[in-house]
Regions:
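Structural beta-alpha unit
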Residues: 1-17, 31, 92-126, 163-168
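Small/aliphatic-rich secondary-structure junction motif
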Residues: 11-70, 99, 164
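Short, well-ordered secondary-structure micro-motifs
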Residues: 35, 62-65, 115-116, 138-140, ...
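General small-molecule cofactor/ligand-binding pocket signal
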Residues: 51-53, 102-106, 157
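Short, hinge-like loop/turn segments at secondary-structure boundaries
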Residues: 67-71, 120-121, 144-145
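A short acidic, glycine-rich active-site loop
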Residues: 70-85
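Glycine-rich, Arg-bearing micro-motifs that act as flexible, cationic patches
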Residues: 125-147, 161, 165-168
Length: 168
């Protein structure tokens, strides 16, 4: 049974033709990886390209005023190389005939770069893990997911990892 989905985007009614490009931002944490099966499943089902994105903090975040900036350059290069290698490993693990993937490594403020990549790459969906923080923890640390949701040019699917359950 075929259905047509209509959605309203900034006052305009459009016909939804499915996902073509899905963005999965990762910080390589187990929490972020909990969202990966959702992104992969949606990409396979829609025959969409899956973009794996990692955002490195800006180099300025690492520079200590008492140290020469040049001393940090080799460390930053190693960090960039390690992140690129990790993205490639993830991409290789997902390789298959029914999934097209693409990796992007960038640097800056995470939520800014996620939104920027979604716009630049014309992504139809962002699949993003969330901590689900509330109260004081949320007020102090903020939320990458919340900032992405507020600014994203496309829908955002947030995935909260399973909670720990005691056997008691």
């Amino acid at each position: 049974m075929a259905t047509t989905v209509h959605r309203r985007v900034k006052g305009k009614a459009t016909t939804w033709t499915g996902y073509h490009r899905i963005l999965w931002p990762t910080d390589f944490s187990p929490r972020a990886k909990a969202a990966l099966p959702h992104a992969v499943g949606l990409a396979k089902e829609a025959n969409a390209e899956l973009v794996l994105l990692h955002v490195l903090p800006s180099p300025g975040a690492y520079i200590v005023p008492d140290m020469a900036g040049a001393a940090w350059i080799p460390l930053l290069r190693k960090g960039r190389a390690a992140a690129q290698a990790h993205l490639r490993r993830l991409e290789k693990q997902m390789a298959g005939p029914h999934l097209r993937t693409h990796t992007v490594l960038t640097e800056g403020v995470a939520f800014h770069q996620i939104v920027r990549a979604a716009k630049r790459l014309r992504c139809d969906l962002i699949v993003l893990a969330t901590h689900g923080r509330t109260g004081l923890a949320h007020a102090i640390m903020g939320s990458v997911a919340e900032n992405v949701i507020r600014r994203a040019p496309c829908p955002v699917l947030t995935v909260r990892p399973p909670r720990f359950q005691s056997g008691v």
